[in-house]
């Protein structure tokens, strides 16, 4: 597992991100939380619930950071 000196890791599309990542780790994920208030009136109609979630992309099968915080080809399987 390589961390490029602790300064960056590989993020999406085998580009370097800002966290310390490595093989099988995705450093570019961010988590946000929001609070909302809702009023639900029962018995008027049907409601479709939609949930937002953070996406975890694994399309590049993990990356390794190379020299000077550049990513080597995505060779981690």
Swiss-Prot record:
Which GO terms fall under molecular function for this chain's record? metal ion binding
One Pfam match, by short name? Metallothio_2
What transmembrane ranges does the database entry give? none
> Which tissues is this protein detected in according to the database?
Expressed in the left, stem and flower, at very low levels in roots and is not detectable in mesophyll protoplasts.
Q: List the disulfide bonds.
A: none
Assigned keywords, A-Z: Metal-binding, Metal-thiolate cluster
**Tree of life domain:** Eukaryota
Report if keyword Metal-binding is assigned: yes
Q: Record's PANTHER family?
A: METALLOTHIONEIN-LIKE PROTEIN 2A, METALLOTHIONEIN-LIKE PROTEIN 2B
What does this protein's UniProt record list under function? Answer: Metallothioneins have a high content of cysteine residues that bind various heavy metals.
Family according to the record: Belongs to the metallothionein superfamily. Type 15 family.
- This protein's name: Metallothionein-like protein type 2
Species of origin reads Vicia faba (Broad bean)
Upper taxonomic lineage = Eukaryota, Viridiplantae, Streptophyta, Embryophyta, Tracheophyta
Q: Which gene encodes it?
A: MTI
